Amino acid sequence: ENACSPTSGFHHAHWEEAHGFCTFNGLMLAAVKVLQAGAKKVAIIDCDVHYGDGTQDIIDRLNLGNDIDHWTLGALPAALQPEFQTVFLKHLNRLDADVVLYQAGADAHEKDPLGGWMSTELMRWRDRALFTVMAAKRIPVCWTLAGGYQQPLRKVLELHSTTMKEALRVERLQAVEV
């Protein structure tokens, strides 16, 4: 089953230090706990517009590269942004994991002052694609509502609400098919 942590994933916190407004790395805490509980492979799909440097640092420090598949939007070269849908779907379709931890960054929005290049519709597509492909593969998703620096805050909340609606939409479709 899917789950949501309406918090940030804290992906900038490194092994030895807090960084980039992140005190500890919740994505990695969750990933390690899931592995300790018996999962063979965890995927972290980080769609915050900034590179999840702390997440990668901890994966490297703990030598978890074979156990954790880390894909981060922040590492996508600018030249590939127009091809995001193709690149993202390719990654989702090849993904093989027991659980997906999804950082649904609102700062990827084109009007975000600290990054962003995605339209609202592209972000909706991003969320729908992730939840739909994972549902088809029967891979549970736990997502966080990260990033987002637009003012007024209502704009960020609307983007997070879209992620939640897409997750629920896919859940309802799956329930009807069963």
List each model region and its residues:
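A general "terminal functional-core" signal
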Residues: 1-178
